[in-house]
Amino acid sequence: MASTFSFDIVSDFDRQELVNAVDQVIRDIKGRYDLKDTETTVELVEESINVSTDSEFTLDSVHTILREKAAKRNLSQKIFDFGKVESASGNRVRQEIKLKKGISQEIAKQISKLIRDEFKKVQASIQGDAVRVSAKSKDDLQVVMQRLKQEDYPVALQFTNYR
């Protein structure tokens, strides 16, 4: 039997689910009467989604559709970082929606401090863009998970490598 148990706290998303959500958004835009003739494009590139359309009103509609499709695919709304709306050529607007992945050092320190302050039998260590949490009891780890789910961090947290 293992002497200590651990899990990792990460901020990640399922890339394939995001691809599927963006494909559904594109299909939805082509099928909706109010968006058909707007020549709206939604493009998924490496670390962002680029949206180009004819007005800010249709851009808001695309945001709504994207949020709905992402939610249906169990993707957190916190992965989207909506950038500034830019004017493009010919009365068009475009926006880059960055995709947030990984836990920043600042947030990792907040998580680690919360664990140290509230749970004396649990250790937290920052490892790159993840936080490793370890304890002698699985029950302690489950309590930590429940506590972290109650907090509202600017990134989506997932718990992996439960050992």
UniProtKB/Swiss-Prot annotation:
GO CC terms of this entry: cytosol
Nucleotide-binding keyword on record: yes
Keywords: Nucleotide-binding
Top-level division of the source organism's lineage: Bacteria
Record-level Gene Ontology MF annotations: nucleotide binding
CDD domains linked to this entry: YajQ_like
KW Nucleotidyltransferase (keyword) present: no
Protein purpose: Nucleotide-binding protein.
Sequence similarity: Belongs to the YajQ family.
PANTHER family named in the record: UPF0234 PROTEIN YAJQ
Protein name as it appears in the record: Nucleotide-binding protein Npun_R4736
Organism: Nostoc punctiforme (strain ATCC 29133 / PCC 73102)
